């Protein structure tokens, strides 16, 4: 890591021995270990240990779960919130497990589209609901800081499975719950 940063500092014309930079490689390594800890965790294990047999057959919604991730194209952050709705079949998930699932996938190099899809697919595979929907809204610093430089753009992505994909009324109910 130190060699990487020595080369980086040299390439941008910075003095690697400057007081403020002396411990930067170590600090960045610690930060990266935290930001990308999702590679060391299995999202399926997180869900498998957090569900229980349920009696609810109505829609359950977890709304505005904050996240941040890193764009794999420019290594800049993107951040926002994710809302997940599902209609149980037999399993109900602990609400904190939804946040954990989002955290595991977001703490990896990502693109928003894949993040949204991975959350929906893993949830669908492990919980086996009658339907699941994931809506992700995010701001991308790669879009704000370089290129088109649009600071207020919000990107929205969705992934739908089961009843949410097949039934427009189910989708509409979810969207109405998000508004209320």
Swiss-Prot record:
Pathway: Cofactor biosynthesis; 7,8-dihydroneopterin triphosphate biosynthesis; 7,8-dihydroneopterin triphosphate from GTP: step 1/1
Top-level taxon of the source organism: Bacteria
Residue numbers binding Zn(2+): 71, 74, 142
EC number: 3.5.4.16
This protein's record includes keyword Nucleotide-binding: yes
Catalysis: reaction(s): GTP + H2O = 7,8-dihydroneopterin 3'-triphosphate + formate + H(+)
Pfam family, one: GTP_cyclohydroI
Entry-linked SUPFAM superfamilies: Tetrahydrobiopterin biosynthesis enzymes-like
Keywords for the protein's UniProt record, in alphabetical order: GTP-binding, Hydrolase, Metal-binding, Nucleotide-binding, One-carbon metabolism, Zinc
GO terms (BP aspect): one-carbon metabolic process; tetrahydrobiopterin biosynthetic process; tetrahydrofolate biosynthetic process
Gene3D superfamilies to which the protein is assigned, alphabetical: 1.10.286.10, 3.30.1130.10
GO cellular component: cytoplasm
Cystine crosslinks: none
InterPro entries (UniProt xref): GTP-CH-I_C/QueF, GTP-CH-I_N, GTP_CycHdrlase_I, GTP_CycHdrlase_I_CS, GTP_CycHdrlase_I_dom
NCBIfam families xref list: folE (TIGR00063), PRK09347.1-2 (NF006825), PRK09347.1-3 (NF006826)
PANTHER family per UniProt: GTP CYCLOHYDROLASE 1 (PTHR11109:SF7), GTP CYCLOHYDROLASE I (PTHR11109)
Record note on quaternary structure: Toroid-shaped homodecamer, composed of two pentamers of five dimers.
Family indicated by similarity: Belongs to the GTP cyclohydrolase I family.
Name listed for the protein in its UniProt record: GTP cyclohydrolase 1
């Amino acid at each position: 890591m130190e060699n990487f940063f020595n080369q980086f500092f040299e390439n941008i014309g910075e003095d690697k021995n400057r007081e403020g930079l002396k411990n930067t490689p170590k600090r960045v390594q610690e930060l990266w270990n935290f930001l990308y800890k999702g590679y060391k965790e299995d999202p399926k294990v997180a869900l498998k240990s957090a569900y229980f047999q349920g009696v609810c057959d109505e829609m359950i919604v977890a709304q505005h779960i904050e996240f941040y991730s890193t764009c794999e194209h420019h290594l800049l952050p993107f951040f926002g919130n994710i809302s997940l709705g599902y209609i149980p079949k037999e399993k109900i998930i602990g609400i904190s497990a939804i946040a954990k699932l989002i955290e595991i996938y977001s703490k990896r190099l990502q693109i928003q589209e894949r993040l949204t899809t991975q959350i929906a697919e893993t949830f669908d595979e492990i919980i086996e609901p009658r339907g699941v929907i994931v809506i992700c809204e995010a701001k991308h610093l790669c879009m704000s800081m370089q290129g088109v430089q649009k600071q207020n753009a919000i990107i929205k992505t969705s992934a739908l499975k089961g009843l949410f994909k097949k039934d427009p009324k189910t989708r509409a109910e979810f969207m109405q719950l998000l508004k209320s």
